[in-house]
């Protein structure tokens, strides 16, 4: 992903078809890598930051998911470059302090049920959401891909 972004930035790759990396359990991966090799983990986090900073203009996108964010794996600079931030589940002050600090007052005291939470668009538009429960995931996937 990082090499594809650099090829687009340098002009070597002139294509603009969207490229998206979905990284499930990002925090767990980064923390495990940091336990093995802190320098390598820092290199990976710097590359993630660069993808977030430069990727949008070249149609290179990164989607990460995690059970609970950790400041170690989300340096302040990279946190600011996520275009869409979704938080599902119970209000945890530390999560909102890290990912949506300007919107804590709007969320504080609110109770979220299963599949409910917030979405922050481009750092300014906060919305309350509910992800619907579905029993036909396979059918939805087939429909989305056709």
Which residues does each predicted region cover?
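Conserved ATP-driven motor cores of ASCE-family P-loop NTPases powering translocation/secretion/packaging/pilus
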Residues: 64-145
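Short beta-strand segments at enzyme active-site cores
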Residues: 20-22, 62-66
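Conserved catalytic network of the ASCE P-loop NTPase/AAA+ motor domain
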Residues: 9-15, 47, 52-59, 77-81
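Short, glycine/acidic-enriched loop or turn micro-motifs at the edges of active sites
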Residues: 27-28, 70
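Signal for well-folded cores of large energy- and translation-related assemblies
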Residues: 2, 6-10, 31, 52-56, ...
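Flexible beta-alpha connector loops of hexameric P-loop NTPases
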Residues: 28-45
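Mechanochemical coupling/switch segment within NTP-driven translocation systems
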Residues: 1-23
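Substrate-engagement module of ASCE P-loop NTPases
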Residues: 1-4, 41-64, 91
